[in-house]
């Protein structure tokens, strides 16, 4: 393996969000409390993974990414693997490297790590879900995973739900550069395909209403929505994409009822992108998010 690259202080990517955080006046007795607010500018910085700092932050975000099925994976082992390849992908933090990650992005070589438990679990799980995802183009995934001729990069990315989308293009652009540097160093990152693992959701009638509407058994599912706006753009460049039901799915819609009139049914979501179209997909993310702001 070639010499690992590192991003030092001068190379850190700084993402300025101007502004992102609203600090509301906490005096609920004041008639003006709902209108008064202070604007806080927040700088987000990208860092290499650090084994002494990032384990718990990455593991927490992985648990969020895999949702109800997080219990099916060795998340500790997967977190260790992500952190060990510390020059591929980034964490996004506020203020200081020592803080927990607000977001992370990485890619794992499925073939290279196929015999390691965390990746073996991922391959088995994603192969099964790909067949059930409702897109015939994803049915090739099990074969791609088991063929040494195909090199599938499993892309894992997650962030706190209130993170601004502006942090995403720099993370993806930096990873593209790092992958190319790794390939130049003869490291195993020359992929034929990228499998982006994410989440989506649909709005559904909460089962809390069932007592009042016993005769109405069908749930009213609205259109598919994306937790990550970049997924909608990236999907346009995928050869296959689809959602899947979590194996350990619970009634997650009811747990979120307090925040909106309808429940939220979270689903797994995956996109298979050929390597030749991946850079174009990443560029489209930047174009889309930039145009929206």
Curated annotation (Swiss-Prot):
Residue ranges of coiled coil: none
InterPro entries in the cross-refs: BCP1_family (IPR025602)
Stored Pfam families: BCCIP
Record bears the keyword Transport: yes
Family under the similarity heading: Belongs to the BCP1 family.
GO cellular component terms given for this protein: cytoplasm; nucleus
Subcellular location: Cytoplasm; Nucleus
Biological function: Involved in nuclear export, actin cytoskeleton organization and vesicular transport.
GO BP field: protein transport
Composition bias, Basic and acidic residues: 1-12
Main location: cytoplasm
Ranges where the record places region Disordered: 1-35
Chain intervals with Acidic residues compositional bias: 24-35
Protein's recorded name: Protein bcp-1
Keywords: Cytoplasm, Nucleus, Protein transport, Transport
Organism from which the protein derives: Neurospora crassa (strain ATCC 24698 / 74-OR23-1A / CBS 708.71 / DSM 1257 / FGSC 987)
């Amino acid at each position: 393996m070639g010499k690992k690259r590192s991003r030092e202080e001068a190379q850190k990517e700084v993402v300025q969000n101007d502004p992102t955080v609203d600090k509301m006046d906490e005096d609920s007795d004041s008639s003006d409390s709902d209108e008064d607010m202070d604007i806080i500018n927040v700088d987000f910085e990208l860092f290499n993974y650090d084994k002494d700092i990032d384990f718990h932050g990455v593991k927490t975000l992985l648990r969020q990414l895999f949702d109800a099925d997080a219990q099916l994976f060795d998340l500790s082992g997967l977190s260790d693997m992500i952190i060990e390849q510390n020059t591929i992908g980034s964490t996004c933090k506020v203020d200081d490297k020592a803080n927990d990650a607000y977001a992370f992005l990485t890619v794992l070589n499925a073939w290279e790590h196929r015999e390691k438990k965390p990746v073996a679990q991922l391959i088995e799980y994603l192969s099964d879900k790909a067949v059930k995802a409702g897109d015939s183009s994803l049915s090739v995934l099990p074969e791609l995973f088991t063929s040494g001729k195909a090199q599938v990069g499993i892309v894992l990315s997650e962030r706190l739900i209130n993170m601004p989308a502006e942090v995403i293009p720099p993370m993806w652009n930096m990873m593209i550069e790092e992958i190319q540097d790794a390939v130049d160093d003869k490291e195993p990152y020359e992929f034929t395909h990228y499998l982006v693992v994410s989440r989506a959701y649909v709005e559904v009638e909460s089962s809390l209403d069932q007592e009042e509407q016993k005769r109405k058994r069908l749930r009213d599912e609205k259109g598919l929505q994306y937790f990550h706006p970049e997924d909608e753009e990236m999907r346009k460049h995928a050869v296959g994409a689809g959602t899947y039901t979590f194996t350990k799915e619970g009634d997650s819609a009811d747990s979120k009822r307090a925040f909106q009139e309808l429940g939220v049914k979270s689903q797994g979501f995956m996109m298979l992108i050929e390597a030749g179209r991946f850079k174009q997909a990443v560029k489209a993310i930047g174009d889309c998010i930039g145009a929206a702001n």
